[in-house]
Amino acid sequence: HEIFVEESGNPEGQPILFLHGGPGGGTGAKQRRFFDPSYYRIILFDQRGCGKSKPLGGTLKNTTDNLVNDIELIRKELNINKWIIFGGSWGSTLALAYAIKHPKFVLGLVLRGIFLSRKHELEWFLKDVDIFFPELHNNLLNHIPNTSKKNLLEKYTELVFSNNKDQAYQAAIAWNKFEGSILKLLSPSTSIEANEVDNEFELARAKVQLHYINNNCFVDGEDILEKSKILKDKPITII
């Protein structure tokens, strides 16, 4: 894997690491807006298989432990003594996993839109979200014939990882549109038109996310909560 890392802001400022969501997301200019560039040394990176990292959509040797090790390697390569970790959604899971393993290098945490990859959270995402988004969930089910709540994950995994690129692209786009739409209580965005879609990026995003979900994100969310007690003296902001 080749990991894309970006620095901006004040080179002498307070180091802060942004961890993107997904799994399968990526970073971009908008993530820099969370931070005052005159104060912070801003570090963004695309996790394995994501964004500008290579190979795009790669799932081999792509686990939470691998990502935690990547974060620590980035810290060492950038000669950072201690930093603040900022993570949202899946990034909050990854932030805690890193902080638990390397607490002495963490000044504090900012966690937003918390998702801890616990079994009931994944079950809600796959099966119970139709309570709030019945139409979106039905659209996801109806995209592939003979799909139900019970086999939703299996069906989409099969298609997204299939050798039929056209079917894989369409399944990935449907999956990503659903996942992106349920992250907010606002009306679903209509900004993604067919001619704006990057098929390879959409496929990579879905591949990485399904790879993680099929493996419970390679973590025990309850264990993370229990082990996070060692961070009791760290300043943690939850949004």
Regions found by a protein language model. Name each.
Residues 231-232, 237-239:
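Short beta-strand/loop motif that positions the catalytic acidic residue
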Residues 85-87, 112, 239:
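Short beta-strand immediately N-terminal to the catalytic nucleophile in serine-hydrolase-like folds
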Residues 55-68, 120-129:
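Catalytic nucleophile-loop/oxyanion-hole region of alpha/beta-hydrolase
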Residues 104-156:
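A catalytic-pocket lid/entrance helix-loop region that shapes and gates access to the active site
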Residues 211-228:
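Active-site nucleophile elbow and catalytic-triad environment of alpha/beta-hydrolase enzymes
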Residues 2-55:
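Conserved HGGG/HGGXW glycine-rich cap/lid loop of the alpha/beta-hydrolase fold
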Residues 92-103, 109:
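Short glycine-enriched nucleophile-adjacent loop
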Residues 65-84:
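Conserved acidic catalytic loop of the alpha/beta-hydrolase fold
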